[in-house]
Amino acid sequence: MSYFKTAILLAGLTALFMGVGYLIGGASGAMIALVVAAATNIFAYWNSDKMVLSMYGAQQVDERSAPDLVRMVAGLAGNAQLPMPKVFIMDNPQPNAFATGRNPENAAVAVTTGLMQSLSREELAGVIAHELAHVKNHDTLLMTVTATIAGAVSMLAQFGMFFGGNRDNNNGGLGVIGSIAMMILAPIAAMLVQMAISRSREYAADDLGARICGQPTWLASALAKIENAAHQVPNYDAERAPATAHMFIINPLTGQGMDNLFATHPSTQNRIAALQQLATTLGIRAPQRAAAPARGLWGGAPRSRGPWG
């Protein structure tokens, strides 16, 4: 995702933010919203990654505390010709992962304990490679800033509902009606802006991630496991912050598996099919059997050789 497209997206969300401000306070409300949006954009550029990591209680690890995981990330980052990102672990039973950061030089990859406990080393490598593909494609800036701005739009919409909109403008009763419509439509509009870029971005990261780790079927197998678990193991942190759902490799929210207008991700079945087609195109045969789960990646598990280092 180019910086130009990022700027267009932020401009659209800023315009939506101003529109909500206008419904609350007329022209002065729109101007205040513009100032707040500009400040939020600047703050989000520099701090949104820290906010998201803190929101999920992610703890940074190094080669002493999580040697196998950090070495795996380092090896795959080398394959992708990327600087070594920071590595974080989230204490969450749902298998999932995301990447964040304003550029490859300031990137971070975060995985849940559930992911590390339920996937094989090969599957985990596929997931990490997918997240590094987001970093290489400069998707991480877009994902984190979008989550911050979309969350702000939703908060402002709720504020407008409680305070009843702008009753003193020339639109008469439209202020109350507008605030109700704003409460319903503004968060949806912000979500649709996120969804507009999410699907193609995930397909691109799947493709590049499979090439980074060297085996598309590893990622395909991981996606199937994560999708199945996401419907059974709730992610309460994500439920409290749905604006961040598009950042994860699989939608962490319950009941969102359909590939429809409001889905944060493409259909997992379609993603798996695309990866299987890529494996066929590259002439790569699927492994005979899956390896054992990658238990103990935060310290002490025996190392096995692989393309991750």
UniProtKB/Swiss-Prot annotation:
Protein source organism: Rhodopseudomonas palustris (strain BisA53)
Lineage of producing organism: Bacteria, Pseudomonadati, Pseudomonadota, Alphaproteobacteria, Hyphomicrobiales
One GO BP annotation of this record: proteolysis
CDD domains attached to this UniProt entry: M48B_HtpX_like (cd07336)
Active-site residues annotated for this sequence: E131
Name recorded for this polypeptide: Protease HtpX homolog
EC numbers, comma separated: 3.4.24.-
Classification via Pfam families: Peptidase_M48 (PF01435)
Cellular compartment(s): Cell inner membrane
Cofactor mode of binding and number, as noted: Binds 1 zinc ion per subunit.
GN (gene name): htpX
Keywords, sorted A to Z: Cell inner membrane, Cell membrane, Hydrolase, Membrane, Metal-binding, Metalloprotease, Protease, Transmembrane, Transmembrane helix, Zinc
One Gene Ontology cellular component annotation held by this UniProt entry: plasma membrane
InterPro entries: HtpX_protease, Pept_M48_protease_HtpX, Peptidase_M48
Transmembrane segments: 7-27, 28-48, 145-165, 173-193
Family: Belongs to the peptidase M48B family.
